[in-house]
Regions:
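Negatively charged, low-complexity tracts enriched in Asp/Glu with abundant Ser/Thr
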Residues: 1-29
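Short aromatic-glycine-(Arg/Gly/Cys) micro-motifs in beta-strand/loop hairpins
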Residues: 30-58
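Mixed-charge, Lys/Arg-enriched low-complexity segments
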Residues: 53-91
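Intrinsically disordered, low-complexity boundary segments flanking structured domains
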Residues: 1-2, 49, 70
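Short linear sequence elements within intrinsically disordered, low-complexity coil regions
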Residues: 17-19, 25, 30, 51-54, ...
Length: 91
């Protein structure tokens, strides 16, 4: 089950496990992106999180809206299906 919180941010939308690319580090390490999530710390800005298979955030991008996050993600990967996290209504 996808976590409700990532890096202390509330998860609003997430994806099923899939190949969303990879992150290459300067030391030669490669991490694969298995999940995408749209999160917020304060509801003023939204983050597009790239997560590994352990739900750890390995890259993030900041946007002004959820729609901007979704639009950016769709430029990199087509046919993304977003799942609304209904648990965030309690926060």
């Amino acid at each position: 089950m996808f976590p409700n919180i990532l890096d202390n941010a509330i998860v609003y939308f997430y994806t099923q496990k899939r190949n969303y690319g990879s992150v290459f580090y300067d030391n030669g390490k490669i991490e694969y992106i298995h999940y995408l999530a749209i999160c917020s710390y304060d509801n003023n800005e939204y983050y597009l999180f790239h997560c590994n298979n352990k739900f750890e955030v390995i890259a993030d991008y900041i946007f002004d809206s959820i729609e901007e996050c979704k639009n950016m993600a769709s430029k990199c990967k087509k046919d993304i299906v977003w799942i609304k996290n209904n648990c965030n209504e309690i926060y």
